[in-house]
Amino acid sequence: MATIVDPRDIILAPVISEKSYALLDDNVYIFVVHPDSNKTQIKIAIEKIFAVKVASVNTANRQGKRKRTRTGYGKRKSTKRAIVTLAPGSKPIDLFGAPA
């Protein structure tokens, strides 16, 4: 991705798991992102979508798991995850859409 057309094309979905839920207290959020996006694009997209200040972005490429199917073996698609740390004093991101 050479240029950012829409920040919502970069941030695909939040990761909701026990680990990511525990990290919410530390202002750390995990998102599934576009595989071709870089840390700078992810930071700009998070700041535009959620109106927060990002302190750091770490990324991890996850290989798709090999799964059995009726006809043999298949493979889940590989994903890229971004671990986003918000700056101190930044408001939290509402991932669950609860009324304020």
From Swiss-Prot:
Region forming the signal peptide: none
GO cellular component: ribonucleoprotein complex; ribosome
Keywords, in A-Z order: Ribonucleoprotein, Ribosomal protein, RNA-binding, rRNA-binding
Superkingdom as given in the UniProt entry: Bacteria
Listed InterPro entries: Nucleotide-bd_a/b_plait_sf (IPR012677), Ribosomal_uL23-like (IPR013025), Ribosomal_uL23/eL15/eS24_sf (IPR012678), Ribosomal_uL23_CS (IPR001014)
GO biological-process terms attached to the record: translation
Listed GO MF terms: rRNA binding; structural constituent of ribosome
A Pfam family annotated for this UniProt entry: Ribosomal_L23
Function: One of the early assembly proteins it binds 23S rRNA. One of the proteins that surrounds the polypeptide exit tunnel on the outside of the ribosome. Forms the main docking site for trigger factor binding to the ribosome.
Protein family according to the UniProt entry: Belongs to the universal ribosomal protein uL23 family.
Subunit structure: Part of the 50S ribosomal subunit. Contacts protein L29, and trigger factor when it is bound to the ribosome.
HAMAP family: Ribosomal_uL23_B (MF_01369_B)
Name of the protein in question: Large ribosomal subunit protein uL23
Source organism of the structure: Mycobacterium ulcerans (strain Agy99)
Gene name as annotated: rplW
